[in-house]
């Protein structure tokens, strides 16, 4: 049997057993073995948390006004998910519900709420830190995690619409933010080696919207603002981004009025880990039987 056949069979087995398919593409149930590995990854990432790092955990929704102010709506409207609800009188809502049996479309009665689905874990961090006042030039560090949503419906393994994102965020002087990002780039290569997965670390860009977005993506690569750690999950030709390392310059500093203690606009950076993608990459690399994984990998994950 060829390597390609083994790979295809393994991917199909992950999709049907380690993950459980649902009626929606990119929305899967997670099994006990999957969650065991997620737990190990979470602990491994936590072991690298710097002393003094603040820990924040968020639900999968956030303020719509906050997201609009952050610039996400302008840059990524095609990925956004909004929370809507039925509004009106009891009679009007009942009519919509009962009309469903007659083939009427009840979603016409939906109205947007003040909530959206969180697209990135770090978005809720910046206004919280800004509200506290100036930050030291040496930086404020935050460990943040959230379930996130991006409207990327796909049958491709690892391309989930709802997923868990863990991030370390740095807010401080420009040189502090850059040094933080560079440190995590190097550390991520060590982590990937420790996990026994093949990888490449490359300059990257975000999927900005529209024609103007293509120019933004080019500028992002040219300025080396974003790097991704890629692991070949579905294929060598189109590896999956499982970690990213981003330098936002003064974008969030200007947006939220973040200042360092010398009065300058704060710069920000983050190291982001796609926990579900990393877990899928581990099963794709080492097989479905966790007990048969290399001892060094099991030791790293404490499983």
Provide a role label for each language-model segment:
Residues 2-303:
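TRNA-recognition modules of translation machinery and tRNA-sensing kinases, especially anticodon-binding
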């Amino acid at each position: 049997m060829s390597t390609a056949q083994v790979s295809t069979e393994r991917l199909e087995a992950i999709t049907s057993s380690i993950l459980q398919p649902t009626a929606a593409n990119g929305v899967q149930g997670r099994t006990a073995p999957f969650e065991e590995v997620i737990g190990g990854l979470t602990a491994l990432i936590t072991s690298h948390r710097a002393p003094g790092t603040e820990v924040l955990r968020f639900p999968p929704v956030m303020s719509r006004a906050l997201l609009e102010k952050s610039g996400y709506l302008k840059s990524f409207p095609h990925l956004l998910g909004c929370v809507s609800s039925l509004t009106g009188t009891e009679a009007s809502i009942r009519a919509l519900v009962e009309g469903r049996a007659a083939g009427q479309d009840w979603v016409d009665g939906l109205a947007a709420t003040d909530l959206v689905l969180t697209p990135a874990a770090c978005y809720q961090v910046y206004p919280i830190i800004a509200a506290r006042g100036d930050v030291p030039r040496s930086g404020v560090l935050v460990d943040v995690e959230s379930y996130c949503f991006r409207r990327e419906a796909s049958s491709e393994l690892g391309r989930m619409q709802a997923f868990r994102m863990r991030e370390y965020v740095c807010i401080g002087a420009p040189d502090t933010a850059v040094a933080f990002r560079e440190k995590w780039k190097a550390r991520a290569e060590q982590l990937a080696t420790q996990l026994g997965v093949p990888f490449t670390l490359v300059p990257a860009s975000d999927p900005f919207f529209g024609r103007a977005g293509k120019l933004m993506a080019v500028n992002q690569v040219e300025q080396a603002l974003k790097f991704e750690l890629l692991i070949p999950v579905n294929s060598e030709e189109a590896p999956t981004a499982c970690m990213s390392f981003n330098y936002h310059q003064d974008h969030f500093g200007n947006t939220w009025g973040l200042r360092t203690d010398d009065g300058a606009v704060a710069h920000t950076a983050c190291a982001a880990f796609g926990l579900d993608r990393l877990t899928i990459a581990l099963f794709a690399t080492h097989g479905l039987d966790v007990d048969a994984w290399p001892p060094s990998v099991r030791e790293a994950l404490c499983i």
